[in-house]
Curated annotation (Swiss-Prot):
It comes from Colorado tick fever virus (strain USA/Florio N-7180). Interacts with VP4. Keywords: Hydrolase, Nucleotide-binding, Nucleotidyltransferase, RNA-directed RNA polymerase, Transferase, Viral RNA replication. This is RNA-directed RNA polymerase VP1. Residues 604-880 form the RdRp catalytic domain. Its EC number is 2.7.7.48. The lineage of its organism: Viruses, Riboviria, Orthornavirae, Duplornaviricota, Resentoviricetes.
Length: 1435
């Protein structure tokens, strides 16, 4: 039992609460009259504290936090999974649930009192556990953060020739440290005529408003989730050492948050604030006016602290190391977190290298995820290549205390494998802020959207030219550089050996269109919006958003500018907009969008290059599984001896110029000549019925000195024609909509467009050419035969390769600007030789990329290989836990959504973090607490019970709904909780209060509502009548029907209850004399007489499934005879299913809108498909209906696909007008309809009606024996992950890859809509016959490869089965084989049908992940009820 929270803590809190209450003012509401009506305005004081709308009053908030302190031992017991959930009376869970949910709605003044009441516990400061625990620094907040300097407009200047404001210093590019209130108080504008100062103030305010965007929880909710879930590093170590897979800790003698150094630093920084000094409004971050001078860095430091606490909880950091990380970050905040981060972080890579070199590491060799050997790796010197000098120099930029501290141990490391790998990951928290890097992207355009030189363009001379629009355009070149000439030959060979992805070019172009933005500029969209609103009213706003999607823009262009070349060229030169990307720890980037005309030319390159590079072994495109299989290449490379090169091309988009694009263009142009391709139609006046689709022009060929060899007539195929027109017009202007210091900024016209359809293809193709050439040269012994004489002159000889190249097997991969290279040296054991060979190879990849004109920054290491943000270190994985943020996001468009969506987005990120965590066990309680804190929705109620909502530009106007909100729903909330909370019988609660003259209703889902088949939050320990039903399920629990099975099993009735219920329903079943049900009823009576006292439903199942299924076709006994659905509902069993009904996205209702204009667009889109494609699809659909009675929905027909993409765009664009308030009204209306849920959800309940029985005992696993050594940072020795990996093994590298196949079929195939619908129809057809399946795939327009892939997906899983749930997130179960094949290794069923077998194996896998300690210990039989078999057997 945890000790009761100390009396001193509560007393300290009480004393601080009194001070807080003395600061409370009431808000002043004045009436003022405008010309038309009287209005009220509320004025807030600039000192003291006030109640605010939609937050609990300050007094009640303090009571909630006081109660939370009184019950903190319970919070910790629930958090460490030591407190059982007693099904009949879950009082402790009920209390913690309510307190956390209310704390999430509390006024932040109470959070400040709570924070200031914490007393630091220094128990971990003095334990001898280097490197995990260290002596921490005492928090000293710098003067510049506590009393920030004033804002200065002199940080910026106006570049008058282009009228753009730029930063004078590096710090001003991002968010500088200054007094935030200074800029909010000034007049600001970027409209025409605004002064320089007004523009600067506008830019500064906008930077601050957008500095943090929330993922799915409010600021207060984030704080509550972080403090309640926090586990100190001592508890984390105990969890990791625990024999229990749940990580339960029963004996706790401390309060974890009092050991957090991150909270201690935050306490010191916030000590003078009466409430959180910033808040989140619809406009973004706003600073409180009653907190004095607040630094702009405060919100950043706040979220950095919360994220740091989560990293300590999962074992990435430790409670004492938090102090040193804070010491450095608070020092950086003196100037600006982000600018200092970029300036100081270079040394961290050297620190990592020093840690690895001085440690006794293990090297894991693997092939295709089969661990072949484990060996010791020798230590290396840190002074041999000057690494020590680089470290000392780099550390000078750090805070002086941190610098001295790191220097005191960095050169005396002598660690074994596990702590060394931990330290190497932990040290990275000094490199990257745990935040999305925000700021005005227009100030950092130089890094992302203006041209960079690379290392200059190589020389080339025209080889072939085409006459177009009166000018000769080169389409092929001579390269005097022999390396480049060889690369051109290699590129030509690659495209010649591959067929274009789409042979019908027009259909192919149409098929790759998405629902993303079309790239039109603001005034074009605004003009269309005005026209459509004038014509259609409120729905015009919706149509304007839909019209600006790529798919609809393409429909309109096909009937307009694509009709003739002149219109096409004119439109291609129109200005387009640019978007932006923000990432963790990286500079903001501009994404330059391209018009649909530009995308047409880009599609030509995409259609030819993509199949060419995918045919090589050097790309991973289309092979992504989301799990450890994606890391195979870096694990293989890093596990080999020698150097590895992780090559990052510096600014690949911005340094890609015509030279680089010409290389790929010449290969594609050559492949598209008429004698090879034929003459297909491709817009611009060509017709699909004609065989003569070509443009007659002239071509001439030159020799290497420029002399013309021959000039002749040339027939340009239409793909070639479109390609060349695009090449002429590819530098159309792009406008970056800034909105900070000016309306927009023009970006460079010389930069390669990052928004082009073929951006990734262009970069990947060049990388693949280079690797393919390198492999070919090694195979042909080129370095020994030609390298010496050719490279001698330029000092680039590869002497080791000249001698040993026949022994070298190149290992490498390319995707976009990311490359990795290494080698396997066959038959060579001398380490010095291997180091020389691999060094040559790393230098050669850099040299060849530089020949292409790119500047490269390779990270060459003996230890690490990195690719696509995944790193292998000596053959074991090192993931990037610090790059995943739980509380903030790039866009922030989910915060403020309804509970189900908010919780889903938070849990989705938690799943990702679980897959990268060193100790994932604490995430089980974090998920439960998140479901309680964020599973809420609050509504403001105005006069006459009308819902209040904000609308208008910048959300400035508050409106009331037209009708009073429903109150009938309140009648069902009859059970009392704490603080006037009321509960209904379905695990939902509500609370009503008035604050700041506004009434608020809080609705929440509680208890086990998220432990469901849709959300998959792990069960806590379940206890029923002193029987432990389950010790809690593992953190790897996935959303599946097995969760319904668990809850049904937990709420089953005992014999006496079941018999009583049976007596109540049996008389209703009889319908007069000679009723066939008589014998059935006799049978049930007999069963009650014979069967034992317990496990009624499961015994019933054995006796031919009477209780839960059919007997000779008669109706089954209602399930409520066997299960207590009152209890099932009370503990939240229906919670998620209710949330899906009640909190439904209003955008789904758009399908009911009558929009003739949209129908016209859809019709035009559908008819732009090739007529033979439409005819084949509709013929297959009709044949299926006639022959098999199957109805194929229009949503999956290829004949209707373009229209379906427009429908998809309709559902995806943001809410408009009244949709927000209608969504809220609908919630309250739906609540009134909650009754007889067990009947409403009969099928979904029936999916859990199965039993499992142990057949035999065994203790053998399928995986490698890694528990004793561990495997990299992610699976420490004897950890839960290591044991689970021994049990389940890695996924089969060459086995069925569900995610990769899904990506091929649905993502690459550009199939719109829900994949489940396609699988459901496919499964239905397969159950009839092979012919039916072929007809379905024809109606869907699937290629033979896609049809085969979809068949594999159907046979592999249960997708497409009605009500079946098995939502696997491969990033959560990153290491493990969780395929149905593995389920078959432990589970079998007597039911022989294929769907039954599949369901058994999938549920078996789900059970294995829920309780691996139980289900991996033997072989099991799974039996289904008749009711379940009936559902599985339906077509």
């Amino acid at each position: 039992m945890a000790r009761r929270p100390s009396k001193e803590w509560r007393e300290r809190f009480n004393a601080l609460s009194l001070k807080c209450k003395q600061l409370i003012h009431s808000s002043i509401t004045n009436d003022f009259t405008t010309t038309d009506k009287a209005q009220q305005s509320t004025f807030y004081s600039s000192s003291g504290l006030m109640d605010v709308r939609k937050r609990l009053s300050i007094s009640e908030s303090l009571e909630v936090f006081g109660s939370l302190i009184d019950n903190w031992d319970l919070v910790q017991l629930v958090g460490t999974r030591a407190e059982p959930f007693v099904l009949n009376n879950p009082a402790s869970y009920l209390l913690v649930n309510q307190l956390l949910a209310l704390a999430g709605q509390a006024h932040s003044a109470a959070s400040m009192v709570f924070l200031n009441s914490l007393m630091y516990d220094d128990a971990l400061d003095h334990v001898n556990l280097w490197p995990y625990e260290v002596e921490r620094p005492i928090p000293q907040i710098t003067r510049e953060v506590l009393s920030p300097p004033p804002f200065s407009v002199n940080s910026y200047y106006l570049q008058r020739d282009i009228d753009v404001i730029k930063a004078k210093t590096k710090a001003a590019v991002y968010i500088e440290n200054y007094r935030a209130g200074d800029v909010f108080a000034k007049k600001r504008s970027i409209s025409k005529g605004a002064t320089f100062e007004e523009r600067v103030y506008h830019g500064a305010v906008t930077m601050l408003q957008r500095m943090v965007k929330l993922r799915g929880s409010t600021i207060q909710e984030c704080f509550v989730i972080a403090i309640s879930s926090y586990r100190c590093s001592d508890c984390v170590r105990r969890m990791m050492a625990s024999e229990s897979g749940t990580g339960a800790i029963h004996e706790m003698d401390h309060i974890c948050i009092m050991r957090s150094n991150a909270l201690r630093w935050l306490q010191a920084a916030f000590s003078d604030f009466p409430e959180f000094p910033f808040l989140m409004t619809r406009d973004g971050v706003k600073f409180a006016s009653n907190c004095g001078a607040v630094s702009t860095q405060v919100p950043l430091l706040f979220f950095q602290t919360l994220e740091m606490m989560v990293l300590t909880m999962d074992g990435t950091l430790s409670s004492t190391w938090e102090g040193w990380v804070c010491c450095e970050w608070y020092d950086r905040a003196r100037v600006g977190l982000f600018s200092e981060m970029f300036d100081r972080r270079g040394v961290v890579a050297h620190l990592r290298e020093a840690i690895l070199r001085q440690s006794r590491l293990l090297r894991y060799q693997s092939r295709g995820l089969h661990l072949a050997s484990v060996s010791n790796f020798p230590k290396r010197s840190v002074s041999a290549d000057g690494l020590d000098d680089r470290i000392i120099e780099g550390l000078q930029k750090f805070n002086s205390k941190v610098c001295s501290f790191i220097q005191s141990w960095i050169f005396q490391i002598d660690l074994v494998d596990e702590p060394a790998r931990w330290l190497a990951v932990m040290i990275k928290t000094f490199a990257s802020a745990l935040l999305y890097v925000m700021g005005a992207t227009s100030l950092s355009l130089e890094q992302s959207a203006q041209g960079t030189l690379g290392i200059g363009d190589p020389i080339s001379f025209p080889r072939q030219e085409i006459l177009l629009e009166g000018e000769w355009i080169a389409v092929d070149w001579y390269y005097p550089d022999p390396d480049l000439a060889d690369m051109r030959e290699m590129g030509m060979a690659l495209v010649d050996n591959a067929s274009p992805e789409y042979t019908d070019w027009e259909y192919g172009f149409f098929n790759v269109q998405t629902t993303n933005s079309a790239g039109n500029v603001k005034e074009v969209i605004e003009e269309r919006r005005k026209q459509l609103v004038a014509e259609f009213g409120d729905q015009g706003k919706l149509l304007a958003k839909v019209e600006n999607t790529r798919i609809l823009d393409a429909v309109q262009k096909i009937t307009s500018t694509f009709q003739n070349p002149q219109d096409f060229c004119d439109s291609a030169d129109n200005v387009r907009k640019a978007g932006e990307r923000h990432q963790v720890g990286r500079r903001p980037r501009v994404i330059q969008m391209v018009g649909t005309e530009g995308q047409l030319s880009a599609f030509v390159l995409h259609n030819v290059l993509r199949p060419a590079y995918k045919a090589t072994r050097f790309t991973t495109s289309g092979k992504n599984s989301g799990d450890i299989r994606d890391m195979n290449i870096v694990l293989e490379i890093s596990g080999e001896l020698g150097y590895k090169s992780s090559l990052d091309v510096k600014g690949m988009d911005s340094s890609t110029k015509p030279f680089q694009t010409n290389l790929s263009l010449s290969c594609v142009f050559h492949r598209l000549r008429g004698e090879v391709l034929g003459y297909p139609a491709f817009f611009l006046g060509s017709t699909s019925s004609s065989k003569d689709n070509y443009v007659v022009t002239r071509t001439r060929y030159r020799d290497e000195h420029g002399g013309i060899l021959v000039e002749e007539e040339y027939k340009l195929t239409y793909p070639q024609y479109v390609l060349l027109l695009g090449a002429i017009h590819w530098t159309s202007p792009t406008r970056f909509t800034d909105g900070y210091f000016q309306e927009f900024v023009m970006t460079s016209r010389t930069v390669f467009r990052s928004g082009l359809l073929n951006t990734a293809d262009q970069h990947t193709f060049l990388g693949v050419i280079m690797y393919a050439l390198l492999e070919k040269r090694l195979r042909q012994r080129w370095y020994g035969k030609h390298g010496k004489e050719m490279r001698e002159k330029i000092g680039q000889r590869r002497e080791a390769l000249e001698e040993y190249e026949e022994h070298v097997k190149l290992l490498g991969s390319v995707l976009g600007d990311d490359q990795v290279a290494g080698a396997f040296c066959q038959g060579i054991v001398d380490e010095e030789v291997i180091l020389r060979i691999t060094r040559d190879l790393c230098d050669e990849t850099k040299f060849l990329m530089e020949r292409l004109g790119y500047e490269c920054e390779p990270e060459i290491s003996e230890y690490s290989a990195e690719f696509l943000k995944q790193k292998g270190v000596l053959g074991a994985p090192e993931l990037f836990p610090e790059r995943l943020l739980l509380f903030s996001s790039e866009r922030g468009d989910m915060a403020g959504s309804l509970p189900l969506d908010r919780v889903k987005i938070m849990l989705s990120m938690t799943d990702e973090k679980i897959g990268r965590a060193r100790c994932p066990l604490p995430y089980a309680s974090l998920m439960l607490f998140t479901s309680w804190v964020s599973g809420t929705a609050s509504f403001s109620i105005g006069e006459e019970g009308r819902l209040l909502y904000r609308t208008g530009r910048n959300w400035k106007k508050v409106f009331a709904s037209k009708r009073a909100a429903s109150v009938a729903w309140k009648d069902q909330f009859t059970s009392d909780g704490v603080f006037d909370v009321r509960w209904n019988g379905f695990g939902m609660f509500y609370k009503e209060w008035a604050s700041a003259n506004t009434k608020t209703i809080l609705l929440g889902c509680g208890l086990l509502w998220a432990c469901s088949d849709a959300l998959g939050v792990p069960f806590p320990p379940l206890v029923q009548k002193d029987e432990i039903l389950c010790p809690g399920t593992s953190v790897y629990t996935i959303p599946s029907n097995a969760m319904t099975h668990y809850l049904l099993w937990a709420t089953r009735r005992d014999r006496a209850d079941a018999e009583r219920m049976w007596r109540a329903v049996r008389d209703d079943l009889l319908r007069g004399d000679n009723d066939p049900l008589e014998s059935y009823i006799e049978y049930v009576d007999k069963m009650f007489a014979e069967v034992g006292v317990i496990d009624i439903p499961f015994s019933a199942l054995h006796i031919y499934g009477v209780g839960m299924g059919f007997v000779a076709g008669v109706m089954p006994v209602p399930m409520e005879v066997w299960y207590d659905f009152g209890l099932f509902g009370k503990v939240g069993g229906f919670g998620t299913w209710i949330a899906e009904l009640v909190f439904k996205d209003i955008r789904i209702d758009r399908e009911k809108y009558d929009l003739p204009r949209l129908s016209m667009w859809k019709n035009a889109a559908n008819h732009s498909l090739p007529s033979e494609v439409r005819r084949a699809s509709l013929y297959a659909r009709d044949t299926l209906h006639e022959k098999y009675g199957m109805v194929v929905p229009s949503a999956v027909l290829v004949a209707e696909r373009p229209g379906c993409k427009i429908d998809q765009a309709l559902f995806e664009v943001r809410r408009v007008g009244m949709e927000d308030v209608r969504e809220l009204e609908k919630v309250l209306d739906e609540l009134t309809r909650l009754n007889h849920l067990e009947r409403k959800f009969t099928k979904r309940l029936a999916m859990g009606l199965f039993i499992v029985e142990k057949l035999t005992e065994r203790r053998t696993g399928y995986g490698p024996a890694i528990a004793s050594n561990g495997w990299g940072h992610i699976a420490a020795p004897y950890s839960f992950q290591a044991r689970l990996l021994e049990c389940l093994a890695f996924p089969m590298y060459n086995g069925f890859n569900y995610e990769a196949v899904r990506e091929r079929v649905f993502v690459d195939g550009k199939l719109p809509g829900d994949p489940k619908l396609y699988l459901k129809i496919g499964r239905q057809a397969l159950s009839y016959s092979e012919e039916a399946y072929n007809l379905v795939s024809a109606s869907m327009g699937l290629s033979s490869r896609q049809a085969a892939d979809m068949r594999d997906m159907i046979l592999e899983g249960i997708n497409g089965l009605e009500e079946a749930r098995f939502a696997l997130n491969p990033r959560k179960t990153f290491l493990f084989d969780v395929s149905r094949r593995k389920g078959a290794g432990f589970f079998q069923t007597p039911h022989r049908r294929k769907t039954n077998q599949a369901y058994c194996e999938m549920m078996g896998m789900a059970l294995l992940l829920m309780e691996p300690w139980k289900f991996s210990s033997g072989d099991w039989r799974m039996s289904f009820s008749h009711r379940l078999r009936a559902i599985l057997g339906r077509r």
